[in-house]
Amino acid sequence: MPIVSTVTLSSVLDAREVTLPNFDKQYLDDVSFVTAMTLVLMGNYCQTGHFGGPLAYTPYTVASHLIGPDLGGLKYDYRRPKHPYSDKFMLAGGHNAPVTYALWMVLGEALYRKYENTGNKKYLADYDQTLLPIDCIGFRRSKRGRETILSENGLSDHPAMQQAKIRGIRALSGHSESTDVTNDVNGGPSGIGIATAAGKATFWDIIGASDSPKIMAVEGEFAMTSGHSQETKTQAVAQQVGKRLRVLMSYNNAGIDDELVGGVIQPQYDSYRIVDQWTSYGWNVFTVDDANDMEQVVAAFKAMEDTDPSDRRPMILVGKTTKGWWPGAENGQIPGYGNQITSYKSHPYTFAMNSDYFAALASTFENRYGVKFKGIGDGAITDE
């Protein structure tokens, strides 16, 4: 009699503790909160774009830019982010660009203030390559709108708008573009840029580069179902790019209008497991239970950095995140409001200007840092 077999996969988990040197977790958490608040402010005054995904990406984005290369972060100079030998960052989940816009503004403002206060040119960034807080005004605005918005509203000489005189207001489309600071190339919509990241890693290997530069790409689980992502799985292994390629997956099981596992993929298909999809292709897969926890993120980055360079498997970190994450939330609640808006319901920015939910988010920031936003409690503004 002929024999026909069925096949199932079983995962083998090798958990180990990672010893971390002293690092300033509070500083990273503070930058994450400022970044999250900035991206939500952009959405509030534009009522468009994306909300939950960028928030979920925040700890990944902050850690990659600020923990330094010894802990597995990027080697780069914010003042000259396009230096050819910098590590390469790619926000492959392009619609999550508000988190990078926000962080780059925070970093840009820090250097700007330092330069203004000291006059020391070591703090002077190339403003044509970097972002400043004034660029918030350029979020999802046309070129003409950016050029005239201040003069039409009598704000050209307002003290808060003086940065516009440096090089104008930059347009921020809402998706990662090739001109964006550390983002290496235009990643396009979700599911496309991840293949470009693998190609970048292959390029540096082909020309005989050392372990540097490394290629770091951030993407979500829904986009990893794309055809480009399947090609990435095979080509990165075939090209043996090793630890040069480090993919950071934000796994929150939430897309635009449904869950992936349990929604698009019905729950009875229990062999559909994200981690298995990468281990079965030969990747070196790392996981953490909470990639919105900075200590876990830094530990994973350090573990990837410490991997033997002779191991030529490309690396991916599958970290569970919360779509709609908020650093001021308490047990799934936003103080002063109620249930936190998470999962696919948080995907678009659909809140009215100065809505109750936005005001509640802002109040957690105010309470944490002892500040007060102007006008948030006065309802929607009636002009620009």
Label each region the model flagged.
Residues 43, 64, 68, 104-108, ...:
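Generic structural signal for hydrophobic core residues of well-folded globular domains
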Residues 176-383:
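Glycine-rich ThDP/TPP pyrophosphate-binding loop and its adjacent helix/strand module
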Residues 32-48, 250:
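N-terminal capping segment at the start of a domain
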Residues 51:
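Gly/serine-rich nucleotide phosphate-binding loop at the start of the catalytic core
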Residues 24, 28, 55-239:
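Cofactor-binding active-site loop characterized by glycine-rich and histidine/acidic residues
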Residues 1-2, 32-35, 195:
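Extended, solvent-exposed polar beta/coil surface segments
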Residues 1-30:
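Non-catalytic, mobile gating and regulatory segments of ester bond hydrolases
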